[in-house]
Every structure is written in structure tokens, then in C-alpha cells.
């Protein structure tokens, strides 16, 4: 019998596996083609140099694949470190940093002047074209002051606590993002906003990401965290929730602590027009790609 395969190279299983993965990603790329995906970047992923470089490459890949990624970043630990270096004591209430005039200036410096530019540089180094913004640029995030309700045990009544220059989005003006996206540039946004009377406000990054995702009609909002996602009473990951189910879990006490404001952001975003939100484990390598381009996912998906 003649050797018809003479000279043929044996198949490399690892190369075939890579080809299969790329092929399986095609329908997901088609689903998100020219769609906006907002990624809130923070936590361990942002503090780890290797994960940070991988994150930048993944975001550039999204852009090359036809998606329109928008990155919104946090920076709480870096702000705390700078305040400590300057001898300024940090105070918190309900997870929010009480922010006086001196503190908000440092917050803006760290978020918009340091962290933002580092992320932009990483994206550009990975072969992308990125530009850094904060909510003050183009009046992107118009902010209003936040007052926090606290229970006074002596009078047994709720009082309003003045958090200083801590705000929340009142309005998003997305025109500047439309212009940037049409130029094939990746916007990187620091969560600093400006009030109608010109004051600068420190805003929670999850909240800013959610408001921008709703204003842009995003297909997905991804919140990178340092946890696996939303956990049930048995401690196991809940892979998917409807808005109604998420509200029920908060009401019955299954969800507590820092996960509550994240779920509230998810709910508001979905009700505001975002197709789905994912609380994503940012410690997982290539978590963004796994979530968008495979059936695997890496967290909890919330949708209507």
C-alpha cells in the first residue's frame, strides 16, 4: 500500500485546540460587533503588574474584534496610600470615603493624574489607542452631592451625614464618548465628576460605570471584583440572576455587606437599558475574554 502521507507533518494537538477556541469565539464576536461594553477595572487585577498587562491586551483585543470597550477604573488603595504619605487621615462611613476639600484634590490627582495615565499607557503599549478622561471632561459626569442616612442610637432616629465632596451621577453627557469611539480610540475614565456649580466630586467607580453603560446603551457592563461573584446561602456561586431574584436576595439577607451596592448598581443599569451586567472575578486570568467570548463565564450575570 503506497504511503500517501509521505512528508506530511503530524497534527499538533495544542495548535488544533487554539484553532478550535478561536473558531468557537466567532458567534460571540458577531453578537457584540460594534456594540459597547463597559468594563469597571479595579481590585487585585489593577494592583498586579502581570494581570494588568493581560487586562490591557484583552481590552485591545476587544477593540480589534469589533467591540467598543470603555474602561472605568477605581483606585481606593492608591488614594489611601497617597493620603497616608501626606499625613491625612482617611475616614469612612458605609464604605464611602468622607472627602473634604483637601482630600478631593488628592483624589482627583491620584485618579485622573496617575492611575488613569498608567492604564492608558498599558493599553497603548499593548497596541491599542487609548485616551484618558475624567467625568469633568466634556461635562461627561454631572454630579450631585450624596448624603448618607445613619442611625443615631441616642435619639433612635435617622440623621443625614455630610460626606463632603462625595457625589453620585446626576446626568451623563455621552457626546464626547461617541466622538472618541468613532475615532477607534479606547476611552479610559476616572470616576471624578463635576456639579452644576463647578465643584469636584469623588464618585464610586461602580456607580459611574453603571451610569455610563446605561447612557451608552451598552450590551454588557462588567464589574471586575476580588470575589467569585454573588454567592448563595450555601456559599456556592450563583451564575445567573434576574433583577427580581437579585432584589429578593438582598431583601432576605442572603446578600450583605459590600456586595449590596454592587448589586444595586447592576439592577439600576439593567433597568436603565443595559442588556446584562456581570459581577466578574478579576483574579481569573483573561476573565473579560472568558465572559464575552466563551460559554464559560467567570462570575454572576444579572439581566431582566
UniProtKB/Swiss-Prot annotation:
Single annotated GO MF: ATP binding
Catalytic reaction list: N-acetyl-L-glutamate + ATP = N-acetyl-L-glutamyl 5-phosphate + ADP
Alphabetized InterPro entries for the sequence: AceGlu_kinase-like_sf (IPR036393), AcgluKinase_fam (IPR004662), ArgB (IPR037528), Asp/Glu/Uridylate_kinase (IPR001048), Glu/AcGlu_kinase (IPR001057), NAGK-C (IPR041727)
Residue positions binding substrate: 75-76, 97, 202
Job of this protein: Catalyzes the ATP-dependent phosphorylation of N-acetyl-L-glutamate.
Enzyme class (EC, first level): transferase
This enzyme's EC code(s): 2.7.2.8
Main location group: cytoplasm
Gene Ontology annotations of biological process type: arginine biosynthetic process via ornithine; L-arginine biosynthetic process
Organism: Parvibaculum lavamentivorans (strain DS-1 / DSM 13023 / NCIMB 13966)
HAMAP family cross-referenced by the UniProt entry: ArgB
One cellular-component annotation, GO: cytoplasm
Pathway the protein contributes to: Amino-acid biosynthesis; L-arginine biosynthesis; N(2)-acetyl-L-ornithine from L-glutamate: step 2/4
UniProt keyword annotations, A-Z: Amino-acid biosynthesis, Arginine biosynthesis, ATP-binding, Cytoplasm, Kinase, Nucleotide-binding, Transferase
Family: Belongs to the acetylglutamate kinase family. ArgB subfamily.
Protein name according to UniProt: Acetylglutamate kinase
Gene3D superfamilies to which the protein is assigned, alphabetical: Acetylglutamate kinase-like
Annotated Pfam families: AA_kinase (PF00696)
Site note Transition state stabilizer, residues: 40, 262
Family matches, as SUPFAM superfamilies: Carbamate kinase-like
Location in the cell: Cytoplasm
The organism's place on the tree of life at top rank: Bacteria
Amino acid at each position: 500500500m503506497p504511503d500517501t502521507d509521505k512528508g506530511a507533518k503530524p497534527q499538533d494537538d495544542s495548535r488544533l485546540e487554539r484553532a478550535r477556541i478561536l473558531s468557537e469565539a466567532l458567534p460571540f464576536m458577531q453578537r457584540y460587533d460594534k456594540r459597547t461594553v463597559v468594563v469597571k477595572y479595579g481590585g487585585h487585577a489593577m494592583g498586579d503588574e502581570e494581570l494588568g498587562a493581560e487586562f490591557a491586551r484583552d481590552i485591545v483585543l476587544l477593540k480589534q474584534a469589533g467591540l467598543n470597550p470603555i474602561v472605568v477604573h477605581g483606585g481606593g488603595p492608591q488614594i489611601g496610600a497617597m493620603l497616608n504619605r501626606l499625613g491625612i487621615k482617611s475616614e469612612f462611613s458605609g464604605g464611602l470615603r468622607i472627602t473634604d476639600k483637601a482630600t478631593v484634590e488628592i483624589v482627583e490627582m491620584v485618579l485622573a493624574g496617575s492611575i488613569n495615565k498608567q492604564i492608558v499607557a498599558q493599553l497603548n503599549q499593548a497596541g491599542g489607542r487609548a485616551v484618558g478622561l475624567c467625568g469633568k471632561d466634556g461635562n461627561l459626569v454631572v454630579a450631585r452631592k450624596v448624603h448618607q442616612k445613619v442611625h443615631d442610637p441616642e435619639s433612635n432616629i435617622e440623621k443625614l451625614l455630610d460626606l463632603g465632596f462625595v457625589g453620585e451621577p446626576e446626568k451623563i453627557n455621552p457626546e464626547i464618548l461617541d466622538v472618541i469611539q468613532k475615532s477607534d480610540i479606547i476611552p479610559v475614565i476616572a470616576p471624578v465628576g463635576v456639579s452644576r456649580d463647578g465643584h469636584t466630586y469623588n464618585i464610586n467607580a461602580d456607580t459611574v460605570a453603571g451610569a455610563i453603560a446605561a447612557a451608552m446603551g451598552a450590551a454588557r457592563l462588567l464589574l471586575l471584583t476580588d470575589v467569585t461573584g454573588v454567592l448563595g446561602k450555601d456559599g456556592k456561586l450563583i451564575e445567573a440572576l434576574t433583577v427580581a431574584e437579585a432584589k429578593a436576595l438582598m431583601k432576605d439577607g442572603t446578600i450583605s455587606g459590600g456586595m449590596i451596592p454592587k448589586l444595586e448598581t447592576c439592577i439600576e443599569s439593567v433597568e436603565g437599558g443595559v442588556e446584562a451586567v456581570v459581577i466578574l472575578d478579576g483574579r481569573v486570568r483573561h476573565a473579560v475574554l472568558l465572559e464575552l467570548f466563551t460559554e464559560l463565564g467567570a462570575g454572576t450575570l444579572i439581566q431582566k
